[in-house]
């Protein structure tokens, strides 16, 4: 039996409009403390099942829960970088600290889930400037929940497959040649063409089998 996910109530808005518009969702925006949640590989806003419970606990502690969309979400893995994620998190943090209504005046915390923990470590590995104030973005804490790296995920899920190992070898060769942004052949991913009364699995294959 599939249980319907618990709903979350809050505010949906944009934290940036250039060079691409990116949204975020916040529960209990009136609280001075903010926790930015960063999900793992192929996940995006609202996917992780314990978020309603987390939001409830955070509310008691006068924290709002913030989920956001970044360019590497869903099928963006393999075409993005951890530093790129960190820069988008910095843009979100700057917005939360400087927005006119209910800004972050208390503590700002990052929480990574699974491979999202890599973004927490990358963000905290160097200073991040608040371009609106000229000061360093101050983060009061970083939480790593069930941490795992991309390579560990690969080894536990795809590493035993010959096709995956072949693609990994090709990707390493591209890096050696100075082509870290090169895309590998994705012909092994069969496009979903079947349809029953206009319904099917959509583009889920590109998310469930992301680029290496």
Question: How should each PLM-predicted stretch be described?
Answer:
Residues 47, 71-107:
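Catalytic nucleophile-loop/oxyanion-hole region of alpha/beta-hydrolase
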Residues 122-126:
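Active-site signature of alpha/beta-hydrolase-fold catalytic machinery across serine-
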Residues 33-34, 107-109, 141:
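Structural motif
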Residues 2-15, 128-212:
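The alpha/beta-hydrolase serine catalytic core
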Residues 17-74, 95:
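Short, surface-exposed "cap/lid" segments of acyl-processing enzymes
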Residues 111-120:
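Gly/Ala-rich beta-loop-alpha elbow adjacent to hydrolase catalytic centers
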Residues 13-16, 25, 85-89, 100, ...:
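Lipid deacylating catalytic domains
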Residues 42, 71, 115-116, 148:
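Catalytic metal-binding/acid-base residues of hydrolase active sites
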């Amino acid at each position: 039996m599939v249980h319907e996910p618990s709903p979350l109530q809050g505010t949906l808005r944009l934290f940036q409009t250039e060079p691409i518009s990116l949204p975020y969702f916040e529960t209990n925006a009136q609280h001075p403390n903010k926790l930015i949640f960063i999900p793992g590989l192929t996940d995006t806003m609202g996917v992780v099942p314990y978020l309603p419970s987390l939001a409830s606990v955070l509310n008691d502690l006068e924290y709002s829960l913030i989920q956001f969309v970044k360019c590497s979400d869903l099928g963006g893995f393999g075409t993005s970088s951890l530093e790129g994620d960190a820069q988008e998190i910095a843009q979100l943090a700057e917005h939360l600290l400087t927005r006119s209504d209910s800004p972050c005046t208390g503590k700002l915390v990052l929480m990574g889930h699974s491979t999202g923990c890599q973004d927490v470590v990358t963000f905290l590995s160097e200073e991040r400037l608040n371009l609106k104030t000229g000061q360093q973005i101050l983060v009061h804490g970083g939480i790593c929940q069930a941490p795992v790296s991309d390579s560990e995920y690969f080894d536990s899920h795809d590493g035993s497959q010959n096709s995956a190992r072949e693609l990994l070898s090709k990707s390493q060769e591209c890096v050696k040649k100075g082509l870290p942004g090169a895309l590998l052949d994705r012909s092994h991913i069969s496009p979903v063409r079947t349809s029953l009364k206009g319904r099917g699995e959509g583009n889920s294959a590109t998310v469930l089998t992301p680029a290496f």
